[in-house]
Amino acid sequence: VLRALEPISATSDPAKLSKIYGSRFAKAWELLKEKRVKKYVFNPSGRVMWIVVGKEREYLIYPAVGYCQCDDFFFAVMDGKALACQHLIAQRLAEELSDYDVVEAEDRLFDSLMEDQRRLMLPPREV
């Protein structure tokens, strides 16, 4: 997945990226333009968490390993049917273009945000 994201840089031609990633690039571009890519910076540790706000929920992105929590990543990217999901593409574009919102928070909030993300990954429980 990381190798699949290599073509994305600040000087990349959008038409070329559209050919490489297809409709996922267009969706990623919309996420970028709608300011849905968030870089959380926790202080004083300096830890960073990337979140892309999707239509249904927020997705935790691990850019260093090329991972996203979304279903498209799990079903299409992991099966080799797609190079990357729209959220990973959007995060990479945002970082390369320095076009993202920075959210600064205290370190004590990191664990609760991670717990929220973990809860979102669990299947719904029956009542």
Question: In which residue ranges do the predicted regions lie?
Answer:
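Long, low-complexity, compositionally biased intrinsically disordered regions
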Residues: 1-127
